[in-house]
Structures are given as structure tokens and as C-alpha cells.
Amino acid sequence: MTVVGAALLGLMTGLHTATWGAYKDSPFEGFKWTSYLRSVVLGMGIAVGIAVTTTWTVDLHPVVIVGLVYTFERLATEWWKTIVRRDDQSAYTIPMRLGYRGLPVDNHAIRYTVGVAVIVGLIIACAAATTMEHALPSEPRWATILIGGVGGWLTAAGGAWKDAPIEGFSPWKFMRSPVIATAWAVPLSFLTNDWAILALCAGGFSVASIETYKTFFTGGRPPGKFATKPAIHRVPRLRRVLAVQHTGCWVALAIVVSATALGPLPV
């Protein structure tokens, strides 16, 4: 796959992640071009960065690249919102900034220390998975699939830390990410057997699947972060456009899967 091909995959992935945030949040805070374009630019930038700095676009299936872009874009965006961004937390029912027992942590030193620790921890976890994989004489399929679900467990832990002090702990909500990530790991394990890459990729597709469900299949329920806030913007036409775009991105991904079944992508 060329750099152009990677950029196109990144564009598709970035457009996809941009749709669910804009669809859910626009009735409460209006449509923000900066937030929308952030995901698009990040998706393309991450995909191009992968193509330029690694051999993954040669070694890995395009669908795996898409899953990795989902993960890295979401990690970058959520890390920025949790650690770096300075905005009025009273606008949210659930604070978006790093919190403790439901209250935002305003101390910059603490937030940045936690932010760095999260990055280092993820790097160590990926390195440990790779080391453990290479140390085994063989890689049982069941072990590969279970490792592939680790991204879902990490997502669940982060979500519970943020949401549970406000909403209460929901076992169903907590288990949703691990179960779906593990389910994604089953087909993805036929495309890559690298444990770290599989866990990252399955975690990304788990987020995309859950966000699709929460955005379009919950009967218009407001996102948790705005649960007690009024919807002050009427944007039905915009939301219809975003829904079509979101569906189109899933269709585009299906086309990529079908095309690669016939041979390498032409770009």
C-alpha cells in the first residue's frame, strides 16, 4: 500500500470517528468544525505516519491498519481532552477532564503525570505482549483471541473510572467493551497474529461498533456527558447528513474488505 492509499484509509477512518461525536453532541453544544476536522486530520496524519515510519502498510492487512487508526485517533483525542484541554467542566454532566470520584482534577502537574504514566504504561504493555508472544514455543488460538480482547478491558476500566462516580457502576456497560473487543479479535486474528497489534486493532473496532450503537440505536438517548443538560440546538438536517456519512464509511470499509479478498489494493 502506498502513502496515498494509507492517507485514503486514514481519511475514511477520520470521517467515521468525526460523525458519531458531531451527531451526539451537536444538539447540546452546536456543530463545531474544529472538533469535526480534528478527527479527520488526525486519522489521515496517523495513517500517513504509519506508512512513512513503519512497514505496517506492507506487512499488515488494510483492515488491520484501519483498526489501528481508530485506536490511535481515539487515544490521542481522549488523552488530549482528559489531560490537556482547558474548558468549562460545568458544561458537562460527567467531567471530561481527568477526574477523581466524579470531580475534575484541576492540578496541571497531577494531570500531566497521570497522562505520561498512561502513555508509558501502554508502551510497556505492548512490549510485554510482544515479549511473551515470542517466548512461547507456539501461539494457541485461544490465547491470541483473549489477548486481542485486552483493549476492551482497558477501555472499560477507563470508562468506569470516569462515568461510575456519576452514573453508578453498570456491570453490563463495563463488560460490553471486553466482550465486543474479544468478538472482533476472532476474525481479526486471521489477519494478524501479532498480539499487541491485534489488541490495539480489536480495541479500535470495538470502540467504532459501540459508538455506532450508542449514537444511532438507543432511541435518541442523550450521551452521558450531557445527560442532565438541555438540547438547545435543533440540527435535524445536519444529523441526517452525519448519519448518511457514518453509514457510508461502514460501507466503504466493507468494500475495502471485499476488494482485498480479491488481491492487494491498487493504491
Region roles according to the model:
Residues 5-25, 150-159:
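N-terminal signal-anchor/start-transfer transmembrane helix
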Residues 1-5, 23-33, 53-65, 129-146, ...:
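Membrane-helix interface and helix-disruption motif detector
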Residues 29-40, 92-108, 168-179, 226-242:
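Membrane-interface segments at loop-to-transmembrane junctions
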Residues 81-95, 164-169, 215-230:
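A cytosolic-side transmembrane-helix exit/cap motif
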Residues 95-168:
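Generic multipass alpha-helical transmembrane bundles of integral membrane proteins
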Residues 37-55, 176-191:
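A generic, lipid-embedded transmembrane alpha helix
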Residues 110-126, 240-264:
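Final/C-terminal transmembrane alpha-helix of multipass membrane proteins
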Residues 68-78, 151-155, 202-213:
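Alpha-helical transmembrane segments and their membrane-interface exit regions
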